[in-house]
Every structure is written in C-alpha cells, then in structure tokens.
Amino acid sequence: MTTETRDNFGHFLPIQSRWADMDAYGHVNNAEFYSYIDTAVTGYLVSQGGHDKDAATAIGLVVESGCKYFKPLAFPSVIDCGVRVTKLGRSSVRYEVGVFAAYDPEPAALGFFVHVFVDRDTMRPTDLPAHLRSALEPLLRAGDA
C-alpha cells in the first residue's frame, strides 16, 4: 500500500503493455517495470530537454535504481508513467516514477533511479547541461533540492 497518487507527478508518458511483457503468472514481469521507468525518463529528457544521445558531450549513467511493487499490471493495457525529480544536484539527478494502470489513481509500482552525468570522453562527472537542468526543474518536488 502507498499514499502516492497521480497528483504527485509532473509529467506522464503513456506506454502500451506488450504480450512479451507478461510472465508465467499472467501479469507484467517485475523486470519490465524497469523498462517502463527508463522509457518514461529518457522520453522526457529527449522530448522536453532536447537531449541528443548521439551528439551530447554529457551522458547520464544509472548508478542506483530500485522499485516497490503494489499491484499487478496486465496485457493489454495502457500504463501511465508519471515522472518527478526528488534531487537535482550539480552532476546528478534522482528521478522517481509512478507506474499506473490507466485511470487508476494509485500506482502499481514506484520506481527510482539516479543518473550521474559524465563527460562522454573522460567518463568523469560533469555539470548537468543547462538545457537539461531547465527541463528538470519543473519536475522537482516542492521541498526537494
């Protein structure tokens, strides 16, 4: 059980579940949730932040991730992934993603991951690019930094 709701997330991306996402128990396999979470964040960085993975000098590497599961999802269904930012540092970002069945006010899962942005050539931490910071600031939860 969770107290999270759709209202706690600033951007949503609908994702169609696939037959291949299902496991032997008849619901979306837990590992597929990570794919939904990654797709929601990366989709936001590309569509709202103008991130170009091929041309960017700074790239985000996932250094930590996790997910809590509350209820199953199935095929066929539309899955709404709500994205928020809970930490926006000099070179790192912590995202949280609520994974919702369409029209369900409570999430089926709550996942997170941390990106550390590194220079593509040196693989050393670098400042978060200004265009990405500007795109992520609206998703920062009140009281978080």
State the predicted function of each range.
Residues 32, 64, 96:
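Acidic-residue sensor for enzyme active/binding pockets
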Residues 1-47:
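Catalytic strand-loop segment that frames the active site of acyl-thioester-processing enzymes
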Residues 16, 66, 114:
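Short aromatic/hydrophobic contact patches that present stacked aromatics
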Residues 40, 48, 139-143:
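Alpha-helix boundary/capping residues
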Residues 2-13, 73-75, 86-145:
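HotDog/MaoC-like acyl-thioester-processing domains
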Residues 44-93, 107-108:
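Hydrophobic beta-strand-centered segment that forms part of the acyl-chain substrate-binding groove
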